Structure formats: C-alpha cells, structure tokens
C-alpha cells in the first residue's frame, strides 16, 4: 500500500524474531525516537530512554504466568537487569511506569501549614511573587529567620506550580480539544491525528496491568539424598557440562527439577576448580625443597629420628663422676649437605668409629640408590656436588686421627684449652658461642668450653647428631685450612700477595 503524498512513513519496530549480527560493536537501527542500538540478545534499545510500554506489559504478564526472569530476558531480548528492575518496581509500587529521567527528586522543605498559607496568599493575590510570599510569611510570624529553610523561595515556587499549574494545563487541554473538533475529519491532519491517538491510547503509561505477582520468597536450601548425590556424581564424572537432555534425564531419575540439577552442576564445577587449584599448588610445593605443604597433609618435624635406630654408647670413667656432654643445636640449612657428607665419610674412618663405639647411619638412610622419599628433607635439599660425594665416598680424603680426636678430661675441661695446630689459622674467623644459651649452644670441645654443660652423671654419652656435627666441623676446618695453604703457596709463586697476610682483601 503506497503512502499518501506528503506524508512521512512511520518506521515499524523490528520484530523480536529477527536475527541481528552479534559483533563486538552494537548495531545502530533507525527508530522514531532516534538512533537505536542492538544489544547482545538481539533486542533493540535506545540508550538513555525507558523501555517501551508494551514490552513492560509483556514482562509483567509472563512473570504472572510463572516464567522465570532469565527466560523472559531471552525470549523478549531484554537485558536481565532491566527485567528484574521492572518486576521489582511492580511488586513494590504496582506500577510499570519508568522513573524520572535525570535529575534528583525535589526536597520537601515546606511544612503542610506553610503550604496552606501559601495557597491562601495566592488566592488572595494571584499576581503575588514567591519572594513576596516569603516576606509575608516572615511578617505574619509563620516563620522566623532561624527556622526559614534555605530553599523556601524554590519551595514556594514548586507549591505554586503543583497547586495552580494543574488548572492551567487543564484549561489548555480543553482549548486544544475544542480546536481539534473544529478540524475536518477527512483532512490529512485529522486522519493522522486519529492514528496517533489510537497509538497513544494503546501505549498509555497510565494503563497498569493490574496482575497479581507472587511475592518473591527466599527459597530454602535443597537437601540431597545419598542416592541423588550418587547419580549426580556419576553424571559429573562423564561430563562437567551436561546438555538439556542429560539434565532432564537426571531430573527424572533423581526426582528433582531441571533447574536444581543445573544449579548443582554449577556448584560442583566451582568446587572441582577449587580442588584442582589446591592440588596444583601442592604439586608445585613438592618440587621445592622448602615449599610449604598443603594444610591437609601430615608433616614430620625435620631431623627428628627415633632413638632405637641410632643408639648411643656410654663410655665409663674410672676416676670420677663428671660428664661433659655437648648440647648440639638442630642442624641448620647450611649444615644439611655437610651432615650427609660427614656420614658418608664415616666409612673411611672406621678406626675412629671403632675407637669410640659410635653407631653409623642405617643403610636405608645412607644408600644413594634407595628410593627418595619426598618427606626426607635431607635428600631433597642436597646439591649435585653433595650427591656425588654420597655416591663416591672415596672422593673424600681420609683425615688423620689427630684432627678428630676428642679426649674427655676428668674433672672438667680447662678453660684455657688451646686450639689444635691444624686449626690455628681458622681461630680468628670462629666466634665463640657466649651469646647462646648454655643448654642449646653447640661448640666442639677442641674450640671452646662455653658450650658444654656439666651434669653429675656417671657416664660419657654422645648423641648421634652431636658426634656427626663434630666430625663435620673438624673436617671442614681441616679442608679449608689445606685449601688456604695451597692458595697462599700459589699466590707466593705468582707474586700476587705476601705469604704472611694469609688473605687478600
């Protein structure tokens, strides 16, 4: 049908069934109100303008029939937030009208008594200005300077607009209706006016749907039985994202709704992602020597070994009851590799072990070919050089017995015990353990006597770790002394530094 000459064809709204390209940028569509856009659901909207009235009616009708807001959003191609806001406002106020566009609501600063006086003054003198009404209120004593609101003039103007503006609008509407009746019905303006009136009547905002909606109540948590959980877990092992057919089949088998099944899978996927992240963190921590274990994993304190595996031997003293017992500290990280190296070198010093009757480590602890346990802090923290020493004990040269000999003295150790000749060059770099507590300080007897406690026990006992640490420290001092002597000889030959200095800075 061709349009009448001289008329502008009205743009029809696109039907909801049309498919719009879903790209990253919204598609612009021409609408009677201006440039519209297409949302991600394919629906047309105008930015900053309220949703059309017929769509608001449709939203309320669908909600009245029990359709969920998410389904309403997909079918009408309206955003979920818009649907929820319209339904919430309809439940609270019973109206589907949109709110005010921009601005803030005016403040009601004038009291009802003051408003009555304003109306009375306006009736007496219709040409009275707002500031004149304010002065009249102050003069008559209805308000004083301290109680006059700051926006009294604007409040008076608003009251005048509300009370007396309606009458003026009604008079203007009556005049327009009279002028419209005088126009011919067969004219172009009359035809378009009739069409416009019909469209306006169909989209009148004042026509409320008057449909009762169920008040949204908070749903109680669903409790699943063991049989239902078993069925759901089996389905979750097959797929984490079941389709609609799988969900409906599960709903029939478990006597649940399809929505409950969908929500259960969503929660189960979240729990699975959390568990997977925790497992990855635990696997990463196992790769690090000092990594923190997960919270649910039992841990053993490092260097806490049973006494039955490492027995101690008591050396009886004939002439006295005084015992000199070293109190070692727990080995630090710096000593981990050295403990294992010293224990490996104990095989080459069998004469020293037989002399003092000290028991060595078990084969399972010292065997390099034994399976590595992730809970063993010593084996995990070893460097490749230390592992090579463990695999080849003969690489460590045997030391003379004089470097390792510990001779307990009857009646206590002399405080002026001199350092052995092999350790004389190391004496300045070793600090005494005076600052440490006596019960926990560790010092070998060849260096100092401040780290020993005197107990009246008939017997001389060495802990396994104390003896191993003594061996390691003595061996370390001897090896470093030999290296420094060789370095001094090479430096003297090359003429780099005099031999007397001992160390270059």
Curated annotation (Swiss-Prot):
Q: Name one Pfam family in it.
A: PAX
For bias type Basic and acidic residues, the affected ranges are 167-188
Please provide, alphabetically and separated by semicolons, the GO molecular function terms listed in this UniProt record. Answer: DNA-binding transcription factor activity; DNA-binding transcription factor activity, RNA polymerase II-specific; RNA polymerase II cis-regulatory region sequence-specific DNA binding; sequence-specific double-stranded DNA binding
For this chain, the Swiss-Prot or TrEMBL PTM comment says: Acetylation at Lys-105 and Lys-139 by KAT8 is required for high-level transcription factor activity. Deacetylated by SIRT2.
KW Cell wall biogenesis/degradation (keyword) present: no
List the ranges annotated as motif OAR.
479-491
Assembly notes: Can bind to DNA as a heterodimer with PAX3. Interacts with PAXBP1; the interaction links PAX7 to a WDR5-containing histone methyltransferase complex. Interacts with DAXX.
Kindly provide the name given to this protein in its UniProt entry: Paired box protein Pax-7
Q: Which gene encodes it?
A: PAX7
């Amino acid at each position: 049908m061709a349009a009448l000459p001289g008329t502008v064809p009205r743009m029809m709204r696109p039907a909801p069934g049309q498919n719009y390209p879903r790209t990253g940028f919204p598609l612009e569509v021409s609408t009677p109100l201006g440039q519209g856009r297409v949302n991600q659901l394919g629906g047309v909207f105008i930015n900053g303008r309220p949703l059309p009235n017929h769509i608001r009616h449709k939203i309320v009708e669908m909600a009245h029939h029990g359709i969920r807001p998410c389904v309403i959003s997909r079918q009408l191609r309206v955003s979920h937030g818009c649907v929820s806001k319209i339904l919430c406002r309809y439940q609270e106020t019973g109206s589907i009208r949109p709110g005010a566009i921009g601005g803030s609501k005016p403040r009601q600063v004038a009291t009802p008594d003051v408003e009555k006086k304003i109306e009375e003054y306006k009736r007496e003198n219709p040409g009275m200005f707002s500031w004149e009404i304010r002065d009249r209120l102050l003069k008559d004593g209805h308000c004083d300077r301290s109680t006059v609101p700051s926006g009294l003039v604007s409040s008076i103007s608003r009251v005048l607009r509300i009370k007396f503006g309606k009458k003026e609008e009604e008079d203007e509407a009556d005049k327009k209706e009279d002028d419209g009746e005088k126009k011919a019905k067969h004219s172009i303006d009359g035809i378009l006016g009739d069409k416009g009136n019909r469209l306006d009547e169909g989209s009148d905002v004042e026509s409320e749907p008057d449909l009762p909606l169920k008040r949204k109540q908070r749903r109680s948590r669903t409790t699943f039985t063991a049989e239902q959980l078993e069925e759901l877990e089996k389905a979750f092992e097959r797929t984490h994202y079941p389709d609609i057919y799988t969900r409906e089949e599960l709903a029939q088998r478990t006597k649940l709704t399809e929505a409950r099944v969908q929500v259960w899978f969503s929660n189960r996927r979240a729990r699975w992602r959390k568990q997977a992240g925790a497992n990855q963190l635990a696997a990463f921590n196992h790769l690090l020597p000092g990594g923190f274990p997960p919270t649910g994993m039992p841990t053993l304190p490092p260097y806490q070994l049973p006494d039955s595996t490492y027995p101690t031997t008591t050396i009886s003293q004939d002439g006295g009851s005084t015992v000199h017992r070293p109190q070692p500290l727990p080995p630090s990280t710096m000593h981990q590799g050295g403990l294992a190296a010293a224990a490996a070198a104990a095989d080459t010093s069998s004469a020293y072990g037989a002399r003092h009757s000290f028991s060595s480590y078990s084969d399972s602890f010292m065997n390099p070919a034994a399976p590595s346990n992730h809970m063993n802090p010593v084996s995990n923290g070893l460097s490749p050089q230390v592992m090579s020493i463990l695999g080849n004990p003969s690489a460590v040269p045997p030391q003379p017995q004089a470097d390792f000999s510990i001779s307990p003295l009857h009646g206590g150790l002399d405080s002026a015990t001199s350092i052995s000749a092999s350790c004389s060059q190391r004496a300045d770099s070793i600090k005494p353990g005076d600052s440490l507590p006596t019960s926990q300080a560790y010092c070998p007897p060849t260096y100092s006597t401040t780290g020993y406690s005197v107990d009246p026990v008939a017997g001389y006992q060495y802990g396994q770790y104390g003896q191993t640490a003594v061996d390691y420290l003595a061996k370390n001092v001897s090896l470093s002394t030999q290296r420094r002597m060789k370095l001094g000889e090479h430096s003297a030959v090359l003429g780099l530094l005099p031999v007397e200095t001992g160390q270059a800075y």
